[in-house]
Amino acid sequence: MFLAGVLCMCAAAASALFGSWSLCHTPTADPTALALRAMAPTQLAAAVMLAAGGVVAVAAPGHTALMVVIVCIAGAVGTLAAGSWQSAQYALRRETASPTANCVGSCAVCTQACH
């Protein structure tokens, strides 16, 4: 279980690093950067779950540690999946709501002023 604990802690550190990196960048209108920034809170939550699983894997008895590690990994993966889905939906909604999204290059029939 020691190896599983170390791997969980390394995954937690990587997730926390990517989450912090996403939060440190300035907000932009780019949908990809927006989706990455929206993923940061779920990455940090997954990092906390993985760190807890890693600590329990190192400190607790074998059977208990195995159960907790499985639950923590499943929770972290589920959190990242739900966060990806939500941030992608948010970025798409924001992109379609922008006023420049209606201008698709057909200037001959356009009645709007160019931005």
UniProtKB/Swiss-Prot annotation:
The record's GO CC annotations read:
plasma membrane
- Which residues are listed as membrane-spanning? 1-21, 33-53, 54-74
Q: Just give the chief location class.
A: membrane
Membrane topology qualifier = Multi-pass membrane protein
Its domain of life reads Bacteria
Subcellular location field: Cell membrane
- Alphabetized UniProt keyword annotations: Cell membrane, Membrane, Transmembrane, Transmembrane helix
Family, per the entry?
To M.leprae ML0030.
Instruction: Please report the name of this protein according to its UniProt entry.
Output: Uncharacterized protein MT0044
Could you tell me which species this protein originates from?
Mycobacterium tuberculosis (strain CDC 1551 / Oshkosh)
